[in-house]
A protein has these predicted regions:
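Hydrophobic beta-strand segments of well-ordered beta-sheets in folded domains
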Residues: 2-11, 36-41, 66-69, 91-98, ...
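Nucleotide-sugar donor-binding patch of glycosyltransferase catalytic domains
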Residues: 46, 50-62, 68, 213-251
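Short, flexible/disordered intra-domain loops and linkers
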Residues: 46-54, 151-158, 182-183
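Conserved donor-binding/catalytic core segment of Leloir-type glycosyltransferases
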Residues: 138-151
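N-terminal pre-catalytic "stem/leader" segment of glycosyltransferase-like enzymes
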Residues: 1-58
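A glycine-rich helix N-cap at a beta->alpha junction
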Residues: 44-96
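A nucleotide-sugar donor-handling region in carbohydrate enzymes
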Residues: 74-141
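Donor-binding and catalytic core of enzymes assembling or modifying cell-surface/extracellular glycoconjugates
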Residues: 18-26, 148, 156-157, 161-242
């Protein structure tokens, strides 16, 4: 993991959102799969605080056992991204590398590291643990998620209704913070199971955009935004490049 933010100067990167953590493990899984190698994700103490010691293992449990390992380093204070890589190498991991994105580099993107852009073009479409005893899902449905910690990314009720009118014939199963079902609100394995049974995922730029990339083909992920293209996150630009539908059929 990178130790410092690519958008804020000299700011520790803590993987604060669910999407940050899902993205990191999906990226690690894809790298290991495509390079036929074991992957260990090294974390700083800022990536292992608050609720994160419980969150990381929950996300890992969605992936094949042993495909990705994580190791937090709680006693080290990195002074830069490369300093953290050098520290990991000194701990005996001689092949440790930093991560960069060559397609949409951010303002403080590191200069050294492996360009991981191509590994996000793979959509593994994993299976999920059978949760059918816990969930009574419709026969034909889409998973939907609108809530976000960012008001800029959220959709108001009028936009939601306009978008969902495109999906006539499908029932709506809401996942995430607005779900009525507690399991679909708080349990990733149940949300994952619902996604594997859904025809499409419909939503916004959020943690569930990243989670959907574990289970859906890109053309079956439909993301909507009211932001102009020059305000999109690098995740949104990359999603469009990789075949995810953005604002499809909405003017």
């Amino acid at each position: 993991m990178r130790a410092y933010s690519t958008v804020k100067k000299n700011f520790h990167y803590g993987a604060p959102g669910l999407g940050d953590r899902v993205h990191s493990i999906l990226l690690s899984y894809n790298y290991g799969l495509l390079e036929n190698t074991q992957v260990m994700l090294h974390l700083t103490k800022y990536q292992w605080n608050r609720h994160k010691p419980e969150s990381w293992p929950e996300i890992l449990s969605l992936f094949p056992r042993g495909s990705v390992a994580i190791m937090p380093h709680l006693d080290y204070e990195p002074i830069s991204n490369q300093d953290f890589v050098d520290y990991i190498k000194q701990k005996g991991y001689s092949n440790a590398e930093g991560q960069i994105y060559g397609d949409y580099p951010q303002r403080f993107e590191p200069k050294q590291g492996v360009d991981l852009t191509k590994y996000l073009k793979h959509f593994p479409q994993l299976s999920a643990e059978d949760c059918s005893k816990d969930l009574n899902l419709p026969k034909k449905f889409v998973t939907v998620q609108w809530d976000s910690t960012s008001k800029r990314r959220s959709m108001d009720n009028n936009w939601q209704a306009k978008i969902l009118s495109k999906y006539k014939g499908y029932e709506v199963v809401t996942v995430g913070g607005q779900a009525d079902n507690e399991l679909l609100r708080n349990s990733l394995k149940h949300i994952a199971y619902a996604m594997t049974k859904a025809e499409y995922h419909v939503g916004i730029d959020s943690g569930f955009l990243h989670l959907s990339q574990v289970y859906f083909a890109p053309e079956n992920i439909h993301i909507y935004t009211t932001s102009p293209k020059n305000r999109w996150s690098h995740h949104m630009h990359r999603a469009k490049d990789n075949g995810i539908k953005i604002n499809d059929g909405i003017n």
